[in-house]
């Protein structure tokens, strides 16, 4: 079965979020189980630098101007690149300029991505024709509208990585992107008087997936649906919206092979974890105290990620003699808030503003607890990394966090199902109480070790997700 993944990011070449991690691993896992999966991406500078050896597949002019379609390989997976420098030849973030202004021609840049995706199902490459087009997030959402307009020459799947980003543009652009005006309708592309690329993906695809079962349920409610609850609940009722959990790329995120950490370890030999903890404490200039419960947080600093909840409850960590290390950047007032915490408690709390891939790995390997107190979280990857590394996740019960972490209660510990700590209300008080429970378990080393073992034995491999996607494709 020939699968074309239409997307806008690819780890490690170009990443703004978890979407890149998914595309960096899923097609490879699918090929390992016998599918024939390829990518389609815009030829951004970061992508072409990483994939220098390509051949021309097609050359044409359309609504977006002159375009060359190239083909190459990356990590053993075939990849098509849309070479249109006037649209994609921009350094840095693929969606906005250095001042965080969205590019004014994004409607055309991502319409072209969708258009080429549909053409690859109708013979644009005479040697390979997609049988299933799998579009990811709003950037690729128009792809399934173009497929629909062509009489659906291939089956289609649309994956929602984050519903908050909808790709909305003026309906005036419809004339410029080669779609009939009849598609601009509430039963089509229209959302709040604009074209919604995300709604296009949902409405016209044969099936949509969310990146966890709980998130698939949550987005049918007004609180999470951003005005799309009617469409989404209808899709769910028809069996056209399902949740499939993301996986962990074990070539990159496994404590026994991780290239970024100084001391490897595995379930049967955990000595390296203690050594990584000491290295992490030294990096952040905190006391190298093995007995201090070390909390880590690697995140975008936004309210969505619950950073404000942590700021208001972090004194609990200090009071109990724990340590807190934070890596991330984001909203200026939250950056300032965590800086002030570190200044107030220099023996217990340390912060690095920015992003550092190597440090993020050391934090996951060296921490005892990884904090993910999100208000909403479609899937979440950091809690999965925590499970893999025996760094117990402390999470809020939402989205993929609810699907992947089992709270440590006396019953669940005894049943050997506990894998972390879970709280429900998005309040500082609820988070504070959960922190207290983590400290209580830390005082029972044997119980802590049991939970850590059960966490590390969880299977969130990409092979498992690849099998679930294959089952979905086969029933379309």
Curated annotation (Swiss-Prot):
Function (record text): Synthesizes alpha-1,4-glucan chains using ADP-glucose.
InterPro entries: Glyco_trans_1, GS/SS, Starch_synth_cat_dom
Gene Ontology MF terms in the entry: alpha-1,4-glucan glucosyltransferase (ADP-glucose donor) activity; alpha-1,4-glucan glucosyltransferase (UDP-glucose donor) activity
Record's keyword annotation contains Transferase: yes
PANTHER family: ALPHA AMYLASE DOMAIN-CONTAINING PROTEIN, GRANULE-BOUND STARCH SYNTHASE 1, CHLOROPLASTIC/AMYLOPLASTIC
Catalytic reaction equation(s): [(1->4)-alpha-D-glucosyl](n) + ADP-alpha-D-glucose = [(1->4)-alpha-D-glucosyl](n+1) + ADP + H(+)
Residues the record lists as binding ADP-alpha-D-glucose: 15
Organism: Haemophilus influenzae (strain ATCC 51907 / DSM 11121 / KW20 / Rd)
Name of the protein in its database record: Glycogen synthase
Cystines in this chain: none
Entry EC number(s): 2.4.1.21
Keyword Ligase attributed: no
Keywords, ordered alphabetically: Glycogen biosynthesis, Glycosyltransferase, Transferase
CDD domains found in the cross-reference section: GT5_Glycogen_synthase_DULL1-like (cd03791)
Family: Belongs to the glycosyltransferase 1 family. Bacterial/plant glycogen synthase subfamily.
One example of a Gene Ontology biological process annotation: glycogen biosynthetic process
């Amino acid at each position: 079965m020939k699968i074309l993944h239409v997307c806008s990011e690819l780890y490690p070449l170009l990443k703004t979020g978890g979407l890149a991690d998914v595309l960096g691993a899923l097609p490879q896992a699918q090929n390992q189980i016998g599918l024939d999966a390829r990518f389609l991406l815009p030829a951004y500078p970061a992508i072409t630098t990483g994939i220098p050896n390509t051949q021309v597949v097609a050359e044409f002019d359309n609504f977006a101007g002159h375009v060359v379609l190239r083909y190459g390989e990356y990590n053993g997976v075939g990849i098509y690149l849309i070479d249109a420098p006037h649209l994609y030849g921009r350094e840095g973030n693929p969606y906005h300029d250095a001042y965080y202004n969205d590019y004014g021609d994004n409607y055309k840049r991502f319409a072209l991505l969708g258009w080429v995706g549909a053409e690859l199902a109708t013979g644009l490459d005479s040697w390979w024709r997609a049988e299933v087009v799998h579009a990811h997030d709003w950037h690729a959402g128009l792809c399934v509208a173009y497929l629909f307009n062509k009489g659906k020459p291939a089956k289609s799947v649309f994956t929602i990585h984050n519903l908050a980003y909808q790709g909305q543009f003026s309906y005036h652009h419809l004339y410029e992107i080669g779609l009939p005006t009849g598609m601009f309708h509430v039963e089509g592309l229209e959302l709040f008087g604009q074209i919604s690329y995300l709604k296009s993906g949902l409405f016209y695809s044969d099936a949509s997936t969310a990146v966890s079962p709980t998130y698939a349920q949550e987005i049918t409610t007004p609180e999470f649906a951003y005005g799309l609850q009617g469409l989404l609940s209808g899709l769910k009722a028809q069996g056209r919206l399902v949740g499939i959990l993301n996986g962990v790329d074990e070539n990159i995120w496994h404590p026994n092979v991780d290239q970024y950490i100084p001391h490897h370890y595995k379930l049967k030999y955990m000595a390296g974890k203690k050594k990584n903890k000491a290295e992490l404490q030294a990096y952040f200039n905190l006391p190298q105290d093995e007995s201090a419960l070390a909390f880590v947080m690697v995140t975008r600093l936004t309210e969505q990620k619950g950073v404000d909840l942590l700021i208001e409850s972090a004194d609990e960590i200090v009071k109990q003699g724990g340590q807190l290390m934070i890596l991330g950047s984001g909203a200026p007032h939250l950056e300032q808030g965590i800086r002030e915490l570190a200044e107030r408690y220099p023996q217990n709390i340390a912060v690095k503003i920015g992003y550092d891939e190597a440090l993020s790995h050391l934090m996951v390997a060296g921490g005892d607890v990884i904090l993910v107190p999100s208000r909403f979280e479609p899937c979440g990857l950091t809690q999965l990394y925590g499970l893999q590394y025996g760094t117990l996740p402390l999470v809020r019960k939402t989205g993929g966090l609810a699907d992947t972490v089992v709270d440590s209660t006396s019953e669940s510990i005894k049943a050997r199902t506990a894998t972390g700590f879970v709280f429900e209300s998005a309040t500082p008080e609820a988070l504070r109480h959960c922190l207290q429970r983590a400290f209580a378990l830390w005082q029972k080393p044997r119980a802590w070790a049991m939970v850590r073992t059960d966490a590390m034995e969880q299977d969130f491999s990409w092979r498992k997700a690849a099998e679930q996607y294959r089952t979905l494709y086969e029933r379309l």
